[in-house]
Amino acid sequence: MAQLWGGRFTKETDQLVYKFNASISFDQRFYEQDIKGSMAHVTMLAQQGILTDAEKETIITGLQGILDDVKSGKLEITDKYEDIHSFVEANLIDRVGDAGKKLHTGRSRNDQVALDMKLYIRDEVQETDTLIKEMLEAILGIMENNLETYMPGFTHLQKAQPITLAHHMGAYFEMFKRDHERMKDIYARMNTCPLGSGALAGTTYPLDRAYTAKLLGFDGPTMNSMDGVSDRDYLIEYLSALSMIMMHLSRFSEDVIIWNSNEYKFVEIDDAYSTGSSIMPQKKNPDIAELVRGKTGRVYAALTGLLVTMKGIPLAYNKDMQEDKELPFDAIDTTKGCLQLFAGMLRTMTFKNDRMEESAKHGFTNATDAADYLVNHGVPFRDAHGIVGQLVLLCLDKKIPLDDLPLEEYKKISPVFEEDIYEAISLKTCVEKRNTTGAPGVKPMQEAVDSYKKYMEEY
């Protein structure tokens, strides 16, 4: 067992206690952040005259060697060590001798792990944002090519009004655009350096915390040492943002699953993103979309778990906070994997434009426009609503759409109707008349696409 403590103890740690307490099995993914943080720390110590330049160079050379050897696989991280910090320090001492024992001067594992976590999450926020960009690019590509691809819009999973595929995809662009903005917001707020906070009360050494923060790319040091070591707000915010991403992906998945069904046939998922059945030869299942929908719960669980962990912890650091890693790591890996797969599925998906347009022609998606026709001819909307409701009932009885109802039948219910009612309720007219900002008409949708393209150029 390699530990960084033990001088005041008279007994060896019980093996079960050691295993229960150890975190090396999961915090080893911090190895790069831990080493980079240590390099910045010793650089600052040398600048402040706490270490000599020779000691600094010796330690940094040793740390770089550990980093290179771990990356190449030459050096393995094992459960011989309690955590990633003890792994790095023990290996450093083995390589450079007594100079390595000075690495931890002016530092506690409390501010060290707080730094490691911030560096790691900062990297993950950027990686997540890159994957969000890929989603946005995939969605925008579909929008550009489908400004006049008509389809039904739904409320309560029932056909409601005609829209376009571009309009439907634009809703998801807006969702993931907000996810991108959340990533920027999280990064800006979390970008302060906790190193130098010590265990909770700083240190007596003349550290230059601003210099360390600058070396590591932070905007500055944290301004309260107790908060510096015990803050996990940024991680909770990140998990909340990941939960939002997964919620958006889950809703998108539900649409894809429905559209892919034989009852809808709006899309065909590429073979590379589908699976079959072990017993039913005809099956082509939307498993990626279903798994994304299913995995959303585990990301929510990570957020809820950390909130529950943190809610009762007094200041400052407590061992409970070791539980800020395993579930969040899983949530990060899950969300990134789902984003990557979903973008690939979208890019290779075939949209059945004719099928979508045919579906939009049925289900009385033009009923609102029939009511608007009456309003434009002086009928109060509430009366127009009732008149069209009667027309729908008549068409249901005759098993025909409004477009096929003879004019004399229209006139029996309201004499206001004339021959131009058919043009007014045509699919193209229904969509094109909706030309205000954010509506599905070609003009507002082209404006949206142009705006989104500019947004992506500045991403």
Predicted regions and their residues:
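Generic, well-ordered alpha-helical scaffold segments in large soluble proteins
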Residues: 41, 62, 66-69, 91, ...
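Conserved hydrophobic residue
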Residues: 50-51, 75, 264-265, 380, ...
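Charged, flexible cofactor/metal-binding loops and thiol motifs
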Residues: 122, 129, 144, 152, ...
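Glycine-rich cofactor/substrate-binding loops
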Residues: 2-37, 98-99, 280-459
